[in-house]
Amino acid sequence: MKRISLFILALVLIVSGMNAQQVVWQPDVIIKLTPEWKGERYPDGRPKVPDELLERLKNCAFEEVQGYLGMHGYRNVFENFASLYENGWHIIHPERVMTGRALTAQFMPMRPDFNDYVQAQAKEEGTHTPVTNYAPIIKLQEGDIYVADSYGKMEGGTLIGSNLGNAIANASKRGVIYNGSLRDYEGLEAIGENFNGWIRGYDPSGIQQMMTAWVNAPIRIGRITILPGDAILAKKNLGTSAKDAPL
């Protein structure tokens, strides 16, 4: 009986402590998360890496970027997924190089009680629409790359199709990096120069039994921990996340 009482008490403490967990991380938290950045920021708190730096980053080899960041203590900045999955990345337009600023999202398997909390907490934070796979897209700015961890889910894990892909292209003029899948591949491929994607694969199914856990928070993509606002360099079969590097 004593063990059961302690277990129930632990659950009560966990649930009561959930009020502190943000859904959309707020600007003051992101600023505290990225204190090394001394330059301009977006209103949401993310570092706004200059466009000039992002253009220069396109011409950098991964060895240069990884070497420089490694000297400054940042060693987990490179991922090609080949170490985890046989097929590595699938790239919609492999001939293109993509750089941009990370806007992050974490997806999880649907759990109704947690999703209820997410919806209620987001409303308290000022979000006026349901928190779905569209929630990160409406926050995109030009130059952003939408980076999401959807835990590698393929069937039923398709975060976007061509409609949302067009919305991303119009807003960010960049594209996506997903540890997961998408649908309507041919429609996404036809969007044009303002969209590209690094994904695990694609599937004709619609998104099912998934929930958005948080937006603009730290996420993991393979071997990389990505923070909101990180500068991203994505090339053929490869991806890297860079800090404030004077390249």
Annotate each PLM feature:
Residues 21-71:
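N-terminal pre-domain segments of enzymes
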Residues 45, 168, 230-232:
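Buried hydrophobic positions in well-ordered alpha/beta secondary-structure cores of metabolic enzymes
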Residues 62-64, 76-228, 241-247:
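Feature captures the catalytic cores and cofactor-binding loops of soluble hydro-lyases/lyases
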Residues 231-232, 237-240:
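Channel- or pocket-lining gating/hinge segments that regulate access to a cavity or pore
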Residues 5-16:
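Bacterial N-terminal signal peptides
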